[in-house]
Amino acid sequence: MIKERKPSKSRAPGKGHKQIPGVAKESQPIARTRTGNVEFTPAKTHDMVRSLFDPTLKKSFLECWISLAILSNVVLCYFMATKFGASFTKKFFLWQYVFWRLCYNVGIGVVLHFQSNYETLTNFAKMRSLFSKKNQQWLARFCRFEIESKMPNTYCLEEYPEEFNVWLLFRQFVDLILMQDFTTYILFVVLSIPKTVLSSHTVSFALGVIMILFNVWVKVDAHRVVKDYAWYWGDFFFFQDSKLVFDGVFNVSPHPMYSIGYMGYYGLSLISGDYKVLLVSIGGHLLQFLFLKYCENPHIEKIYGSDAVENDNAHIDELLVKENPNYSKPLITKGLWFTNVDKLRLTDYFTILTVASIVLFTFFLKPSTKALFWATLVAKITTSLFISLVLHKQSTSKWFTRLFLKNGYTQVHSFYQWQFLYNYCLTVSYTLLILQTWSQFRHLESRNYTQIIFGFLLCWLQKWCDDEILTAISEFGWFYGDFFLTNYISSRKLNSRGIYRYLSNPERFLGVAGCWGAVLITHFSPYNLILAALWTAANIALVKLVEEPHVSKVYGTSERKSGVSKTLMGFKPIRRFSEIMDKMELRLVRHLTSNDSPFEEEAPTSEEAQWNEVVQLALQSVTANLAPNCEFKLGDGKCDTFIIPGPVEAHWKLPSKLYNNDDWIGLYKVFETGEDRQRTRVSSNGRWTGTNEAAFPYSGRPKKSIVKFQRTGDFVNGTVKFDHSLMFYEEGVYELRYHSGNTHKVLMISQPFRLSLPIVKAESAEELSEGLHQFLAEVHALDGNSFNPNSNRYLGDRFLKGLIKKASGVDLSVKYLRRINYDVSIIGKRVQEIKAVLENLE
């Protein structure tokens, strides 16, 4: 009904300004004309309600006629309803409202357009000297009379520039149009309200009253902030140097007088319960938005400049396209259509065909509403868990990026694939929700069209919210780019532009408005209530448990205060309640996201301590009842750790009567041999050697494994060596077992020992390549500059993968290693690239 103006920016007077004497006062704002820069102090004015209805203020001729017109409409309404019936009267005032609404949005819009671009009204007044006492034409005399009858006796027309006087006259015609617009609309609504409204629409009536009261607060608070100057489009006529405070309602919503300032329209529609009133209200509201778009916004941008601020995320989107030839803007599902469709991207076809398949399946096979409900429920739970899990693991360990890096892909490629997965999940879940809602709607026995229209309004609200979010944070933010491409962020500062100026997390509630709209459309179907609750809970959980912890980690702990929060926190009861809820919420989030052990007394055990414990336990199990002349020790007997690939030397000694030429020694994992110390019940898998060179001549055992064999009187002793050809290439605790004859009977068990991976330096690509080259040469698995997996049956590519990970902390997949033919130079370079990416993500 009443419009909003953007509060004026402070303007410092320029040089050469003319000063009109006798009007400037320090306590009042200074204004100046748009052309000529003539400075003056605006006279005090009053808002429309006081001007028209305050009996202590002077009334002009037009103001009296406006009051009379309001009263006449009320009397006319009563007379016509009595004489011609409510139906005819309602149509009469509907068309009258349409006329005045067009006078407002089209008439005033055209006048302001010409005033903004050509100062038409001001030039007309100057050319005809409308405010000069020398001009005695009827129009000039009427204009002077109108202003003098309105303003105080001390007001002198000729001391003020034409711009200000024209603005005062313009206000009178604005008051006439706005009051007629308001009065005719109210009378139309009153005639549409049923007599049983209180008994049959109690909830709707209560909600409607709340919306009307909220509308009143918006109007009052808006006028408190912008005053008469902006309320009546003063900057179309002159500029005012005043510093206005952006608070209250202007922190709650963009263009509050055009958006939430029309909440009363919808409140009255609820009270009336008539969908025709709602449609009329929507039409009037839509005209107001058109007025904003084609009249106000062009003037605002011309006078104050565009509100558009450089978007860091948009720069990142451009950078990704420029630096990565294979990257293109991702497919985004927006409502019922797609944007950024790439004709050469197969995933786009896959997404679109999936939607088409689901729709065709639903319309041709006609599944039951219950079946569609379960399909939607399962799809939403599955996709929400998948999205939340991926984002959580990506935030805590960069899991998704590492997954692609270790398989030879780039960081940007991982983000590219995530964009497809995220959009695909959203598309499938919302497609099923729309089809489920349609199926439920078709089976309704009765339809409340007012409720249905409100449902579609909520769907439009979610669509608008999504568009505003996408505009504010761009595609980079829409797809959670700060989880995947943290190194692309130049400014670690939260975005507070666009919709984020008013709401910190608009997607939390406005992002599910359409789901609750579906509840209204289906007349509060239990199925849709469950789905809407699920959508809301999933959104809140994602924001609280995943997004907010990650935002704190990336952007710091400074909280982004939204305009709505600032306004609501101005009310003490709400502020206190919010503090209590924040404390409860913090405890819950900490409990759900804590990785600490539930037993505080249970201290974490280091890896080294765990290994030592394992060795000690194994030592206690070694056979201790051998004859005193039997020996079986490793090396010098003091070392219990060997670096792969060894060698591991074992010295043994037996009485001659116990020795057999077919005795053999095998290498085993301690945990695989079990508690049986008398007999080995697991295979050595070829990791064994005889005790003398003459034994097992056809076994293919390497002769070099027998270092020493000697008979001395009543004893036999020797030394065997387990080198790279007989070695385990896996960290762990091992033991050697001496077996009697060609059997698995155990005579002696060595002290348990630990096999550890070699230390390979990885400070640079060259250093890592050289270390790998040296190790592979030691184990005779080097073929040129590459690892040969066929050279050693025990040394596989998985060991090489583990060695690289231990040396550098970087995980490369076996698939990738095979793809590059195990080239150690490429491995070194790739590891450094991945390390650089992961370091930048921290």
Curated annotation (Swiss-Prot):
The chain crosses the membrane at residues 61-81, 92-112, 173-193, 197-217, 244-264, 271-291, 346-366, 371-391, 415-435, 469-489, 515-535. Residues 1-60, 113-172, 218-243, 292-345, 392-414, 490-514 are lumenal. The keyword Signal does not apply. Residues 1-28 are annotated as: Disordered. GO terms for cellular component: endoplasmic reticulum membrane. It catalyses: a 1,2-diacyl-sn-glycero-3-phosphoethanolamine + S-adenosyl-L-methionine = a 1,2-diacyl-sn-glycero-3-phospho-N-methylethanolamine + S-adenosyl-L-homocysteine + H(+). InterPro entries: Phopholipid_MeTrfase, Phosphatid-EA_MeTrfase_fun. Residues 8-18 have a biased composition (Basic residues). Catalyzes the first step of the methylation pathway of phosphatidylcholine biosynthesis, the SAM-dependent methylation of phosphatidylethanolamine (PE) to phosphatidylmonomethylethanolamine (PMME). This is Phosphatidylethanolamine N-methyltransferase. It comes from Lachancea thermotolerans (strain ATCC 56472 / CBS 6340 / NRRL Y-8284) (Yeast). The gene is CHO2.
